[in-house]
Amino acid sequence: MKVRCFCVVLLVSGTLCLHADRSYPGNSVPVTLNVQSR
């Protein structure tokens, strides 16, 4: 069970990182910070 949850977390974090890279090229900063600043 723990392994499955860990895999899910990795997949979610990976997709979030991809979306962040596409939205903000050259910025590896979390999207939440950018959204809150606006």
From Swiss-Prot:
Induction of this protein: by what? Expressed under many growth conditions, up-regulated in macrophages.
One Gene Ontology cellular component term attached to this UniProt record is: plasma membrane
Q: State what the entry records as the consequence of deleting this gene.
A: No changes in biofilm formation, persister cell formation or bacteriophage resistance; no visible phenotype for a double timR-timP deletion. A timR deletion leads to mild envelope stress.
Ranges annotated as spanning the membrane: 1-20
Please provide the record's keywords in A-Z order.
Answer: Cell inner membrane, Cell membrane, Membrane, Toxin-antitoxin system, Transmembrane
Q: Where in the cell is it found?
A: Cell inner membrane
Q: Which membrane topology describes this protein?
A: Single-pass membrane protein
Function recorded in the entry: Toxic component of a probable type I toxin-antitoxin (TA) system. Neutralized by sRNA antitoxin TimR which binds to the 5' UTR of timP mRNA and inhibits translation. When TimP is expressed from its promoter in the absence of antitoxin leads to mild cell stress; overexpression in situ is toxic to the cell and causes membrane leakage. The antitoxin gene is encoded immediately upstream and transcribed divergently from the toxin gene; antitoxin RNA is less stable than timP mRNA.
Similarity comment text for this entry? Belongs to the TimP toxin family.
What this protein is called in its record is Toxic protein TimP
